[in-house]
Amino acid sequence: MATTTPSRSTRSSMQSPARGTSTPLSPTRISRLQEKEELRHLNDRLAVYIDRVRALELENDRLMVKISEKEEVTTREVSGIKNLYESELADARKVLDETARERARLQIELGKFRSDLDELNKNYKKKDADLSTAQGRIKDLEALFHRSEAELGTALGEKRSLEAEVADLRAQLSKTEDAHRVAKKQLEKETLMRVDFENRMQSLQEEMDFRKNIYEEESRETRKRHERRIVEVDRGHHYDYESKLAQALDELRKQHDEQVKMYKEELEQTYQAKLDNIKRSSDHNDKAANTALEELTERRMRIETLGYQLSGLQKQANAAEERIRELEELLSSDRDKYRKLLDSKEREMAEMRDQMQQQLNEYQELLDVKLALDLEINAYRKLLEGEEERLKLSPSPESRVTVSRATSSSSSATRTSRSKRRRVEEEYEEGGASTGFGAGHSLGSSRITASEGSSRTITSGQSSTTRFHLSQQASATGSISIEEIDLEGKYVHLKNNSDKDQSLGNWRLKRKIGEEEEIVYKFTPKYVLKAGQSVKIYSADAGVAHSPPSILVWKNQSSWGTGSNIRTYLVNTEEEEVAVRTVTKSVLRNVEEEEDEDADFGEEDLFHQQGDPRTTSRGCSVM
């Protein structure tokens, strides 16, 4: 560490090399030149650090904008896909319930057809036995016909007894058929109710499992957007298969109903004709025998026809069952395919998470570097303050001049160095940008005061040092706050601090600078500031591209303006001020100094030999 203290000296001892080029450099001059080079080197390092921090902050803003845009896109896509998936799943569940109900009904009808077939077989066997018995009796009657007329009376009596038995049997058969029909209907109703309750229970269970899986696996919902296309394609095939199957089953059902009805009518007619023939056979034995033989032949042919038809119906029923099994296998294969697609989408989501984590790690490393730079700059400033304290010197604007590179060849360079120092202090003490001025937000009001600065003007006879003070005051009555304003008039930064979107349609952002005319920026009618997001409104000369909703450009205004008293406020559609930020620049003092003291700030830039007894109150320390 080197300590230098400027002092007042005579003109003969402070002459520049240009006045005495033949005089060799003294050790004091060499030491001062070395200290000057060392300070320039340190100033270069500080400038590099500041540029690096600004670049990191710009990169940080860019990354935050990218992350917010990605989060908005992801949220929008996930919500849309979730709604589509829920609707598609509800439709699929409804179709499955209808299919299960239709299958149960078809199974009931198939069981009914099988029971009708068994009943027809039993009736056929019974009628065949009755036919054999009738043939035996016909032979007996033919034998008895030749015996005597007395036996004819006996036969007539037997005939009457048989007719009574047939009537009793018919009545019993009718009652039994009615009871059987009622029982079958009740069984069908109970079966349908049981199947319906089972389907409803299964649907509720599936819905409960689905809601549980939805909340546990929200990350998988993004894969549904690929599934939507597949479902739309397969849905058409599925609907075609269902419509064709339903049409075929309806046709089979109608054919079965018509055939069964026809069979019943024909059997009843045949049975009635047989009874009539038996009655007439007692009166006309010869005619009855021939009629019985013809009826037997017709019945045999009819039974064979019915057998063929029943076998055809059984084949159709088997084909329908085979088709149902094929459709179930197709549905199972589709489910397996969709499951594989879901697994692949899960892997893609895992890769995306890894990439996001890697980006976050890189971002954290950048933040660590920025923090290290901030600490180094703060240490630099504390060393300067400690050296001033050690030498019992009050902090003066001249002590800050050494932070930035400057020469005494012109007064403009000195003013530039002090201006740079002021901006550095505003950036690292206030947390704002290099040219911006702002701080945190609150619903009340907050006051933030920047570091003092100074400017120096050198004339032929004297110099003046002007110190100024920057302060700002911000307040907000709602969720929108004015987060930052640029002192050079390039932009104004607004932020939505709530968790809800805020419509800024037709709101106006106004700026008043001293006594100048007020300028007004009006938002578009449909502009909305998202929750937690921010927007910067740049002037036309800022050189920034228009990129809504985070970056807006005021094309009709070249600059927001600069001045010593800047008031920026946001007004809603009801002319109420919802956010205000005021920046004030005030002059603290103006000190006049003599010409010979200005000479000390000449070519050697406040450097002198250490330990000079002519040390004044000015001094600085350099790391």
Swiss-Prot record:
Residue ranges of the propeptide: 621-623
Modified sites of kind Cysteine methyl ester: C620
GO cellular component: intermediate filament; nuclear envelope; nuclear lamina; nuclear matrix; nucleoplasm
Region ranges (Tail): 380-592
Region (Linker 2) location: 212-235
Post-translational changes noted in the entry: Phosphorylation plays a key role in lamin organization, subcellular localization and nuclear envelope disintegration. Phosphorylation by CDK1 at Ser-26 at the onset of mitosis drives lamin disassembly and nuclear envelope breakdown.
Similarity annotation: Belongs to the intermediate filament family.
PANTHER family xrefs: LAMIN DM0-RELATED, LAMIN-B2
Protein name: Lamin-B2.L
Organism: Xenopus laevis
Taxonomic classification: Eukaryota, Metazoa, Chordata, Craniata, Vertebrata
Gene: lmnb2.L
